[in-house]
Amino acid sequence: MGLSPSNISKLFEPFGFEQAKAVIAAVSGGSDSLGLLFLVRDYMAMLQNPPRLIAVTVDHQLRAESKAEAENVGLLCRQYGIEHRILVWDEAKPTSGLAAAARTARYRLLVQAARDVGGAFIVTGHTQDDQIETFLMRKERSAHAEARGLAAMSLRSLLDGLGLEGSVELDRPLLSVSRQTLRDELRGRGINWVDDPSNANTEYERPRIRHGIAAEADRQTVLDQIAEAGAARERDNAALIAALGNPASLRADANGALLVDPQLYAALPGNARRLFSGLLAAIAGGRRFLPGDSERSRIERVLSGDDDTHRLTVFGALIERGDSGSPHRFLREKRNLPKLHLEPGKPIVWDGRFRFLNEGMMDFELAAPGRQELADFLKSQNIEIESRKREALLVSPALYREGRLFALLFLQDGEFQQDIHIERHFAIFDHVLPGHDFDLARAVEARIGRICAEMS
């Protein structure tokens, strides 16, 4: 007995697919993704004006069989009248961190597929089993009892956007459904699936957890723990969001530093305080993730005054404790700043902190100036600035043309080239934004803002 139409409707109805032009279903050929494909197909058949359903298989080219497996998914889709595409990760493969690189490439290709067809949704076949495994993996890695990642996967995430704008939505409708239920569903339909041999290789973390502690764990106990972790994350977010409702809580100054009110910071509950400082370190440092537990503890000791040090560098950020009524300051550390080519018409992100679009005709280079180079440029322009402004310029993007320093961001008297648009980029929100944190991202963005300059 398969899932009833009412059960299928309950799984997919909350996502609002009927408003979409197209929905991309990520289908590898395994039981989870095929179960997803046929359930979402059934749901689309219930809609009066269903969107276009496109199954997309990513061939990572990591196994000799992967091409044939992707083609077999295509044959199955044709048999059932489902549109199908194969996308290939044909880049050089890294010698380490292969699983993470493959995941990043897979989502990049899926996002591009969605954008190509005007789609706003990608759906994946993550199951309740994946949720349990993810929780146990993160719990095993983390020494901090309140680790935010223990809230596990969210039903919704946003990919490759500007916070809540311009993103493609990644949806996981099957997080309440077991893998066994999906396999029973496929057997009832006479549909076979392929088991990826890497899923049985316990040298990898997830298979090791799957065939170890996840197999022995009581499912309901783990699900209750996931719910508790999710509630804790919501409490921390809510406390910080409430504090950010005060306009004095957080602002960006003219030099690009993030300024925090010390009294408001000290009044936050402990976990919300650690979250706040970790978020600002990630934003100032251009990072996609929060600092680790030990790094956030170091920040907390310095900002609380429990450490004699007034400043520290961590996670690419320089952090200074405020004194005598001055705010805490978070800004970029002067290390590992990139040099990028800014082509006409091609948006790029510089250092995880700024998004550029060159709407003109000329090419530029983007890089942070050296100390002597900056001094020479300011002297040539007869510009005098105070030391903090100078330090900020040394970690800010500058425009170069034919090897010459041409213009400086955050220097209003600089000679700016026309048609260069800049806005603030939050790597921690704009790469992947879990549904748990939608409201938090809104609150932070409301205090800091996006637009830096419209150079013309």
Curated annotation (Swiss-Prot):
It catalyses: cytidine(34) in tRNA(Ile2) + L-lysine + ATP = lysidine(34) in tRNA(Ile2) + AMP + diphosphate + H(+). The keyword DNA-binding does not apply. Its EC number is 6.3.4.19. ATP binds at residues 28-33. The N-terminal region contains the highly conserved SGGXDS motif, predicted to be a P-loop motif involved in ATP binding. Ligates lysine onto the cytidine present at position 34 of the AUA codon-specific tRNA(Ile) that contains the anticodon CAU, in an ATP-dependent manner. Cytidine is converted to lysidine, thus changing the amino acid specificity of the tRNA from methionine to isoleucine. NCBIfam families: lysidine_TilS_N (TIGR02432). This is tRNA(Ile)-lysidine synthase. The lineage of its organism: Bacteria, Pseudomonadati, Pseudomonadota, Alphaproteobacteria, Hyphomicrobiales.
